[in-house]
């Protein structure tokens, strides 16, 4: 546990004490901005240290402006993954097309680093956030919130509310403390949300897929590239973020109902994934074997969190805890960064009641727009039927295949001799290729880009890696987001 004084505090009033549960992305980002606005911040995290490693994630659109204002953009640019090739394979392991990843992913790529989207390892982002704030706030590792108690306050009209005069927190480690506000930044399966709003099922929107992600030895000589195998309803991908001796492996499959029981048991999880890919070819059998032995395996369902409100009394939610968009949108990290920025800015000169209301008013439409990206590109990129798969492959070929690598490494892992292209219904979407549709029309060789890869990138100040909201909602978000910059300048 460390604590130092805030570098600069422009306020003369006593600093309000706040607790943030979760030290992933949203938590440290929120801590940074609340500290900037004069709050005394404590962050509690159940892990023993800041979590490192993790799969690649995107930082794009408005989130780029947030990290620039935090001063960590240069560090993230240095950590940029720079994927150079995306190879699509058919059910037999044969190459369908090899294209520029930015064409498929819809990211903004160009010579100007100010507008170029970033792809970094999750651990590189969390490390940058932690480093930016660790000397200015208190961190409690190896601990978590056990209970939250908001004293009930009665008004003159006889109505009761949870606003009270603070939040009494009991930690699992046995400590007890009082805070002016508490924030849940504890992810998709948030305990903070459950304690305040009830079971996760009330807000959980299952999207029809299950996925597994883990690392395995890079025995394929892959470098800065992605390889994805498809059959209807199933996808397997290998993602080499550099020249490392390991690659990220993804297995995704469609399932009509969430396998709730299997997710509670690690061995049942592995059996579930193995059964879904029992007849798969290419390198999938080897991936299944590696999954069995992986010590960093993560298996879950693809889902969103949708809530009618993000706060109760003096407690508010941010990031995945409030509005997880799912990895199918590619916006989870960016929404966490932008949401933290907007929440802190809303509290810069307001009490919790007015601040939480402003947070929702100015951010909700932006969140909804990003969550609704689901389904815009996945049907074309990850088809559910054999006919749709063939149509997708034809469109990929129209993009123009990149020339073969000039070295002597294999262009792809050798296909399994007994591979078959069968599969169950539905479709799966690995995070190595999210479904954004923002790439400008036209490919590098001048060929016409299919409509599912097309779309002019909107103004950076109004997007989070997606289309602008449009209309009053767009203007409201952009105006409020910009106003926070003026406030920051005034306080420096």
Residue ranges and their predicted role:
Residues 2-16, 78, 93-94, 311, ...:
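C-terminal helical "tail/cap" subdomain of flavin- and related membrane-associated enzymes
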Residues 2-21, 35-37, 60-213, 256-274, ...:
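Conserved N-terminal helical subregion
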Residues 20-36, 40-47, 183-184, 272-273, ...:
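Conserved mid-domain beta->alpha element of the FAD-binding
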Residues 208-240, 262:
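Flavin-dependent oxidoreductases
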Residues 218-219, 232, 242, 253-329:
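FAD/FMN-dependent oxidoreductases across multiple families
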């Amino acid at each position: 546990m460390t604590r130092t004084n805030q570098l600069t505090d422009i306020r003369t009033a006593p600093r309000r004490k706040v607790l943030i549960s979760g030290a992933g992305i949203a938590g440290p980002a929120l801590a940074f901005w609340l500290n900037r606005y004069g709050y005394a911040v404590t962050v509690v995290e159940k892990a023993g240290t800041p979590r490192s490693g993790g799969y690649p994630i995107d930082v794009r659109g408005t989130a780029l402006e947030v990290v620039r204002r935090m001063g960590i953009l240069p560090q993230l640019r240095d950590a940029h993954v720079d994927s150079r090739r995306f190879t699509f394979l058919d059910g037999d392991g044969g190459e369908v097309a090899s294209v520029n990843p930015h064409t498929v992913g819809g990211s903004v790529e160009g010579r100007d680093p100010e507008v170029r989207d970033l792809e970094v390892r999750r651990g590189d982002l969390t490390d940058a956030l932690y480093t930016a704030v660790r000397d200015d706030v208190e961190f409690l590792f190896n601990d978590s919130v056990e209970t939250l108690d908001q004293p009930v306050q009665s008004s003159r009209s006889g109505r009761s509310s949870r606003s009270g005069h603070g939040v009494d927190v009991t930690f699992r480690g046995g400590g007890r403390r009082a805070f002016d506000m508490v924030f849940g930044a504890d992810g998709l399966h948030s305990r903070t949300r459950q304690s305040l709003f009830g079971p996760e099922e009330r807000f959980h929107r299952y999207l029809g897929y299950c996925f597994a992600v883990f690392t395995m030895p890079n025995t394929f000589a892959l470098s800065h590239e992605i390889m994805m195998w498809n059959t209807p309803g199933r996808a397997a991908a290998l993602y080499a973020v550099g020249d490392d001796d390991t690659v990220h492996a993804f297995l995704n499959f469609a399932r009509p109902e969430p396998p709730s029981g299997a997710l509670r048991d690690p061995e049942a999880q592995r059996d579930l994934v193995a059964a879904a890919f029992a007849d798969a070819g290419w390198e999938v059998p080897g991936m299944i074997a590696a999954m069995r032995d992986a010590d960093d395996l993560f298996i879950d369902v693809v889902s969103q969190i949708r809530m009618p409100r993000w706060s109760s009394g003096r407690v508010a939610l941010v990031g995945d805890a409030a509005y997880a968009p799912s990895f199918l949108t590619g916006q989870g990290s960016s929404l966490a960064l932008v949401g933290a920025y907007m929440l802190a800015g809303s509290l810069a000169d307001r009490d919790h009641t007015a601040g939480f209301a402003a947070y929702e008013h100015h951010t909700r439409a932006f969140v909804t727009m990003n969550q609704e990206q689901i389904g815009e590109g996945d049907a074309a990129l990850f088809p559910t039927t054999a006919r749709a798969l063939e149509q997708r492959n034809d469109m990929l070929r129209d993009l123009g295949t990149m020339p073969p690598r000039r070295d002597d490494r294999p262009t792809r892992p050798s296909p399994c001799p007994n591979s078959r292209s069968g599969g169950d219904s539905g479709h799966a979407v690995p995070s190595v290729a999210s479904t954004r549709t923002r790439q400008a029309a036209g490919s590098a060789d001048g060929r016409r880009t299919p409509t599912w890869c097309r779309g002019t990138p909107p103004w950076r100040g109004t997007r989070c890696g997606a289309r602008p909201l449009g209309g009053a909602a767009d203007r409201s978000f952009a105006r409020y987001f910009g106003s926070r910059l003026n406030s920051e300048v005034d306080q420096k």
